[in-house]
Amino acid sequence: MVLRNPGTKGIASALDERSGEIFRRIVESYLESGEPLGSRNLSRLLPVSLSPASVRNVMSDLEDLGLIYSPHVSAGRLPTQLGLRFFVDAFMQVGNLSPEERASIERQVHPGNRDRSVENLLTEASQMLSGMSRGAGLVITTKSDPVLKHVEFIRLAPTKALAVLVGEHDQVENRIIELPAGITSAQLTEAANFVNAHLAGQTIPELRTQLEKVKETVRGELDALSQDLVERGLAIWSGSEGDGQPARLIVRGRANLLEGLEGTDDIERLRMLFDDLEKKDSLIEILNLAESGPGVRIFIGSENKLFSLSGSSLIVAPYRDSDDRIVGAVGVIGPTRLNYSRIVPMVDYTAQLMSRLSR
């Protein structure tokens, strides 16, 4: 389910059972409270009796390994980024979703929900991940090639129309297009009827290829303005007027990231994260991260160059279509003290359901 990072394997050999237990307690305390854990409180948590002085000696060794640090003099210890990565790889036990959690995810993301619009499904999936994780939920989808079931052109203004494409699973995609000057409502209907009669049952790229093959038929059945309208509709649906990048990123739960902020440094890091999420390059990067290995990927702090300055963690998994092509990704972004063991199965199950929905 989770792709581990091989870079921390060597650290495990440097820890004995006692050191490992102390390290684990420090990290778990940080993930729960965000506060440093001191030697006196730590000694009370251990299953075996160990004096605070002995605990401090072990903590010193863990600091030498780069796994923990002291935020200021005479404070307790917090895990470093390396420490968090090592904890995730060596100590984290991925939990199981409860029946209630699985049911909650299925209510939002389920193959039986095909009658809802793609936009609504993506938004609800993102909102659901946010609510269950207390981080920011994200869903990315690439431009897909739905099989056409029905087309309609609806005039909005003298020079604009809504081009409506209904896919084979009744998913609806709407685009506003510029109309050829002088086109009539009757010509809008003729253009839609031509597409439905000659081109239904194909994907948009196939439609454009087929249109070239039936140009003689087009000339015989449609006038020049209607031909122009058909070509404009296919062009905007296929994304030829864009740059071919992922179609949309939906992020919900940004307010969750405001909780627990302390001082201007935290606020500035959050601002940088929000700025990163608005950049189109970020969509490509997140998809590339999801594609870089099977299963759920976990990126902590600067391991993910996209969010390295904001000090955020990303848990992400791809979802696939019927041809096993990656067509999007789902995930959670939040502070480095995310509840990784709980969020990983949540993201994994959501990605599985999104894959079923995409088939």
Curated annotation (Swiss-Prot):
Entry-linked InterPro entries: GAF-like_dom_sf, HrcA, HrcA_C, WH-like_DNA-bd_sf, WH_DNA-bd_sf, WHTH_transcript_rep_HrcA_IDD
Write down the Pfam families for this protein, in alphabetical order: HrcA
Supply the source organism for this entry.
Answer: Rhizobium meliloti (strain 1021) (Ensifer meliloti)
Q: Which family is this sequence assigned to? A: Belongs to the HrcA family.
GO function terms (MF aspect)? DNA binding
Recorded hits in Gene3D superfamilies, A to Z, give: 3.30.450.40, Heat-inducible transcription repressor hrca homolog, domain 3, Winged helix-like DNA-binding domain superfamily/Winged helix DNA-binding domain
Cysteine disulfide partners in this protein: none
Keyword Glycosyltransferase appears in the UniProt entry? no
Domain of life, source organism: Bacteria
One of its GO biological process terms is: negative regulation of DNA-templated transcription
Gene name as annotated: hrcA
Q: Does the keyword Transcription regulation apply?
A: yes
| Name this protein carries in UniProt | Heat-inducible transcription repressor HrcA
Functional note: Negative regulator of class I heat shock genes (grpE-dnaK-dnaJ and groELS operons). Prevents heat-shock induction of these operons.
Q: Sorted alphabetically, which keywords does the UniProt record give?
A: Repressor, Stress response, Transcription, Transcription regulation
